[in-house]
């Protein structure tokens, strides 16, 4: 059975508008939506919260044009030449570097190139492998990451003469023991060198070109295994922008002011920035999630929508008294991405902020970020929303058969013009060969479709296949144990992974962060026993933790707040329970 969008959701246009690169596509549509308004009434596309810097559409257009000319001059790209090279971008998660990064990528797209978005939270070894799989023509780094970028090149098989550039500015206090970067060419130097050159015309894409020309190479999150690289074409991301944008357009009565902190080297941040630009909304950028900074920013900017991840939503719900100290009346909705928001966490946040609409979604890097979003007029706790325009879903059960109805659980397979075809192990140029036949991508997520009381069908995510724990031949979803543990007042945060067991094959093991306000006189050993009783007395035998509970100070997370279960699995290799 194939599940598609509800009837009230607008259809995806056919054919897709693929005549421009994605940056120009978003800017053209934005101007069509708000360009006729008085300048002072036009929503500001991007606002840099830390330094109070606004980027208008004109400023962005001018900067993109200047950088396009500068890069063409530096690399001897002739006017009208379609370039196919790949450029690596290693940018820190700090303030206006967000916009510098985005503008740089749009300039590279105008030349025909693709951008390899490296994550600074990756190891040198991981990044070296990435630039070996996608050999870049050049690399751009932020000032604080010059040494990391140089070490990455040295660790890789790439030439030490690889053109290496730095972003011109650093925001915030200078780093201690900062390296000397005076011999590294800057963006400002490129701009100065090319200022008298003729402008470069915008790149127009021929029919079929958008489906094979790569815009971004992104790494998968690596939360459950090794990082992999996927190629995102202009068609992929334009389809995803339209899917999210058309759906959001029917749910928003006025322009929104959104708060975003997810970095642009991650697909969630990339898609959010592009979609909000396309919609004509304003985006307030923070360097990361600092609770006090965000709470102060909301009344100052009159933020209407928060783009968050579930761990941060949980952190806010645990700090209700802190939230009460600020005027948060402008906020109407919270978009939860980067992972499913379970019904218990949903309920906690609704108790703290009953007037906020909590809107969860589902997607992944391989689906170019999004496949479903919550419908504000029919929100359901634990739901990941409804299927978006142009998306088709089907589920395959453990026997390998397609499910034939509602409430049947299976691995989700997705078909959509936004879906990426394969992982990239060897890319010599920013072009791929698109599939010509119908393509269904297995997602690795286990889910089901449920018809809710409204009659609207919703997607519910059960767990990741690779995170499922096989106990005595039965599949155990870690999320079910995590949800139950979070019901206890002692648990601030938790993550459950599988550990080898000689008899059962695997057994669940829980990492737990103690809630600071809970009974400080209770020892870790006593707390483990309390949580064991709480869990094992309520759940079936295959879900029991027994003495497999580890109390920790922190749980490793990716830059966008996802729990890194692969790191947790490494920590419990050869683990034995404490003797108590």
UniProtKB/Swiss-Prot annotation:
Enzyme Commission numbers on file: 6.3.2.-
Upper taxonomic lineage: Eukaryota, Fungi, Dikarya, Ascomycota, Pezizomycotina
Role description: AMP-dependent ligase; part of the gene cluster that mediates the biosynthesis of verlamelin, a lipopeptide that exhibits antifungal activity against plant pathogenic fungi. Verlamelin is a cyclic hexadepsipeptide and is bridged by ester bonding between a 5-hydroxytetradecanoic acid moiety and a carboxyl group on the terminal Val of amide-bonded tetradecanoyl-hexapeptide D-allo-Thr-D-Ala-L-Pro-L-Gln-D-Tyr-L-Val. VlmA and vlmB are altogether regarded as essential components in the biosynthesis of 5-hydroxytetradecanoic acid.
UniProt-listed Gene3D superfamilies: 3.30.300.30, N-terminal domain of ligase-like
Domain of life: Eukaryota
Annotated source species: Lecanicillium sp
Binding site for ATP: 338, 464, 562
Cited PANTHER family: BCDNA.GH02901, LONG-CHAIN-FATTY-ACID--COA LIGASE
Catalytic EC class: ligase
Deleted gene: phenotype: Leads to complete loss of verlamelin production.
Entry binding sites for substrate: 264-265, 562
SUPFAM superfamilies in the cross-refs: Acetyl-CoA synthetase-like
Name assigned to this protein: AMP-dependent ligase vlmC
One MF term in the entry's GO annotations: ATP binding
Pfam families: AMP-binding (PF00501), AMP-binding_C (PF13193)
Keyword ATP-binding applies: yes
Family: Belongs to the ATP-dependent AMP-binding enzyme family.
């Amino acid at each position: 059975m194939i599940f598609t969008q509800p009837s009230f959701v607008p259809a995806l246009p056919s054919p897709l508008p693929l005549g421009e690169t994605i940056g120009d596509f978003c800017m053209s549509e934005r101007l069509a939506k708000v360009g006729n308004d008085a300048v002072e009434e036009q929503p500001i596309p991007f606002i840099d919260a830390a330094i109070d810097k606004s980027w208008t559409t004109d400023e962005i257009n001018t900067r993109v044009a200047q950088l396009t000319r500068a890069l063409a001059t530096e690399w001897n790209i002739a006017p009208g030449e379609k370039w196919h090279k790949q450029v690596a971008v290693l940018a820190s998660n700090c303030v206006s570097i967000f916009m510098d990064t985005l503008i740089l990528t749009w300039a590279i797209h105008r030349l025909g190139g693709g951008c390899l978005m490296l994550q600074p939270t990756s190891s040198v070894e991981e990044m070296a492998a990435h630039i070996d799989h996608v050999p870049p023509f050049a690399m751009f780094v932020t000032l604080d990451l010059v040494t990391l970028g140089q070490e990455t090149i040295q660790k890789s098989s790439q030439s030490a003469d690889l053109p290496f550039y730095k972003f011109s500015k650093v925001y915030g206090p200078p780093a201690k023991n900062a390296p000397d970067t005076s011999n590294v060419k800057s963006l400002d130097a490129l701009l100065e060198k090319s200022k008298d050159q003729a402008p470069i015309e915008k790149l127009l894409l021929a029919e079929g070109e958008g489906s094979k020309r790569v815009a971004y190479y992104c790494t998968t999150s690596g939360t459950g295994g090794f990082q992999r690289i996927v190629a995102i074409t202009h068609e992929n991301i334009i389809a995803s922008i339209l899917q999210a944008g058309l759906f959001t357009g029917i749910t928003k009565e006025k322009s929104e002011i959104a708060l975003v902190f997810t970095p642009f080297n991650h697909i969630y941040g990339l898609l959010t920035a592009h979609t909000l630009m396309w919609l004509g909304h304003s985006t307030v950028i923070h360097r990361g999630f600092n609770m006090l900074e965000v709470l102060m920013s909301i009344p100052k900017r009159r933020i209407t929508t928060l783009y968050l991840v579930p761990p941060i939503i949980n952190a806010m719900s645990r700090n209700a008294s802190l939230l009460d100290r600020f005027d948060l009346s402008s906020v109407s909705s919270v978009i939860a991405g980067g992972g499913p928001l379970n019904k218990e966490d949903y309920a906690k946040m609704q108790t703290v902020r009953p007037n906020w609409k909590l809107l969860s979604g589902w997607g992944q890097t391989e689906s170019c970020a999004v496949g479903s979003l919550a419908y504000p007029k029919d929100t359901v706790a634990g739901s990941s929303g409804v299927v978006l325009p142009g998306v088709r879903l089907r589920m395959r059960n453990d026997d390998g058969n397609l499910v034939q109805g509602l409430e049947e659980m299976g691995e989700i397979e997705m078909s959509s013009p936004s879906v990426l075809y394969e992982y990239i192990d060897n890319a010599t140029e920013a072009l791929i060969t698109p599939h010509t036949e119908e393509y269904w991508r297995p997602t690795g997520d286990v889910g089901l479709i449920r018809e809710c009381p409204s009659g609207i069908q919703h997607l519910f995510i059960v767990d990741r296949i690779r995170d499922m724990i096989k106990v005595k031949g039965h599949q155990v979803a870690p999320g079910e144990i995590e949800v139950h543990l979070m019901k206890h007042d002692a648990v601030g945060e938790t993550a459950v992974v599988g550990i080898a067991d000689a008899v059962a094959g695997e057994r669940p093991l829980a990492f737990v962060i103690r809630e600071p306000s809970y009974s400080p006189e209770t020892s870790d050993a006593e707390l483990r026993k309390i949580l064991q009783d709480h869990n094992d007395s309520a759940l079936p035998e295959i879900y029991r933790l027994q003495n497999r509970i580890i109390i920790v100070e922190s749980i490793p997370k990716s830059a966008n707040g996802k729990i890194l279960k692969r790191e947790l699995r490494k920590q419990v290799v050869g683990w034995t329970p404490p003797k108590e």
